[in-house]
Amino acid sequence: MTLDALKRQAAARALEYVEDGMRLGLGTGSTAKHFVELLGERVRDGLKVVGVPTSEATRADAERCGIPLTTLDDLDRLDLTVDGADEIDPDLNLIKGGGGALLREKIVAAASERMIVIADETKWVAGLGRFPLPIEVIPFGLAATRRAIAEAFTKAGASGQMVVRKGPDGLAFVTDGGHWIFDAHLGQIPDASHLAGLLNPIPGVVEHGLFIGLARVAMLAGAQGIRVVERR
C-alpha cells in the first residue's frame, strides 16, 4: 500500500469522530487534505458541519469540496480539529509546520475541545527533533532573533543549523501571515516542552512548530491497519 493510501486510511478513521452539527478545525498538509476531501463527500450526503481552515490552501480545498466555512471570530470554541503532523512522540507532542501553516494550526488547535492527529506510521518517533523544527519569525531584526533562538537551543541542550525556508522561486518562503520561517535541523530535542517554553517569549518569534499537550488522539496508518493512540 502506498504512503498516500495510508494517509487516506487515517483520514477516513478520523471522520468516524465527526458528528452532525460539529464545528471543525480543518488542518493543512497532504494528510489533512484527504480528511477535507472525505468530509466533503459526507457533506454532500447531508452531514451538517462548519469548518475553520488553518490556511488559505485548506480554505480553497474546503470550498472546492463544498464544506461550509466560518472563522474563529464567529465561534468561541471548536468541537474538534483534525490535522496531520510531521512527527508524533509517545506523549502525543508534535512537530508541525512543514507546510508552513503552524501559526494558524496552533491557534485553531488551542481553540478546540479535542485535536485528532492523523498520519502514516512513519511519523511516529521515540523523541522529537529529526524533522526540522519550523520557527515562524518576523523578518525585521532577523539576525537578533536568530541569535536569541540559538541561545534558547543551547539552554535546552539542543544544537543544529538554522536555515531560512525558501519557496519554489528560491526566495524566502512567506507564510499566510506574512512572516518567514527558520527550519532548525536539531536532530534531537532532549526536552520539547522546555524548549517550547524558551522559544515562546523571544521577541521576533511569532510561533514555533512544537505542539505540546494539544493532541488528544493520534491515528497512525500502517500495513497492519490503523493504530489509535490516546494521550496518557
Curated annotation (Swiss-Prot):
Reaction(s) this enzyme catalyzes, per UniProt: aldehydo-D-ribose 5-phosphate = D-ribulose 5-phosphate
Location of the active site: 105 (proton acceptor)
GO biological process: pentose-phosphate shunt, non-oxidative branch
Keywords per UniProt: Isomerase
InterPro entries to which the protein is assigned, alphabetical: NagB/RpiA_transferase-like, Ribose-5P_isomerase, Ribose5P_isomerase_typA_subgr, Ribose5P_isomerase_type_A
Enzyme class: isomerase
E.C. number(s) listed in UniProt: 5.3.1.6
Binding-site list for substrate: 28-31, 83-86, 96-99, 123
Pathway note: Carbohydrate degradation; pentose phosphate pathway; D-ribose 5-phosphate from D-ribulose 5-phosphate (non-oxidative stage): step 1/1
Molecular function terms, GO-annotated: ribose-5-phosphate isomerase activity
Function: Catalyzes the reversible conversion of ribose-5-phosphate to ribulose 5-phosphate.
Family designation: Belongs to the ribose 5-phosphate isomerase family.
Subunit structure comment from the entry: Homodimer.
Stated name of the protein: Ribose-5-phosphate isomerase A
Organism: Nitrobacter hamburgensis (strain DSM 10229 / NCIMB 13809 / X14)
